[in-house]
Each structure stands twice: as C-alpha cells, then as structure tokens.
C-alpha cells in the first residue's frame, strides 16, 4: 500500500516535461500502447512504463547531471536491464525543444521491442508548431 501512495505523491509533483509527455502517452493515445506513470518496480518508480514492450521512459532534470545522481541512475538501469526492461532517457529541456524527435524515438523503440509492430501509418502525427 505504501508503494501506491508514493506513486500517487510522485504523480502529483510531476514536472512540466512529465505533463507534456504524459499528454502523448496516456489513455493509449500513443499508437495504442498502454503506459503507466510512476510505476513501481523493485525499489524504483519508473516515470512512464509500457509493460507490453518492457520499455521505460525517463525524463531527467538538471540534478541528473551530477556524478552521484548519474551513478544512481546507472545502478537503476542495470537493475531494470536484468529484468529485460529498456530505459530511454531524455532531458526535460529536450522533450520540449525537440518534441518530435522525442516522440519518434519512443515510437521507434516501441516498434523494435513490442511483441507486435504496428504499420507505419499508425505513427503518431507530427506535432504542429504554434506561431
């Protein structure tokens, strides 16, 4: 029960980048794949996890650039890899400035990892730049 409460707290404190990416991934909007936010696996909470493709999408703020945090992130990735889970990492700033690139990277990884690939026409629509 503590895991569920912790996940709820993390969802309430999401960053602007997490809100942006969640708007793409929630409710199977992203080519029909189901993602969960702040999904607990072991002692870790994954930002966005797709069980079907065993894919974890992480959004990192500037604190992840510090050596001790990078070491922690590496340990976490090794733990997840040992369970067959691939992690994609994006800087928060990248997810906004390069939104289409971020979406394409997630889509391509889903295509490579999911038990069934989707036809190209299911690729998420290109983002339209606001003027």
Predicted regions mapped to residue ranges:
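Basic, amphipathic alpha-helical patches used to engage nucleic acids or provide basic targeting signals
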Residues: 9-14, 20, 37, 42-111
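Solvent-exposed, charged helical/coil patches
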Residues: 1-33, 82, 111-131
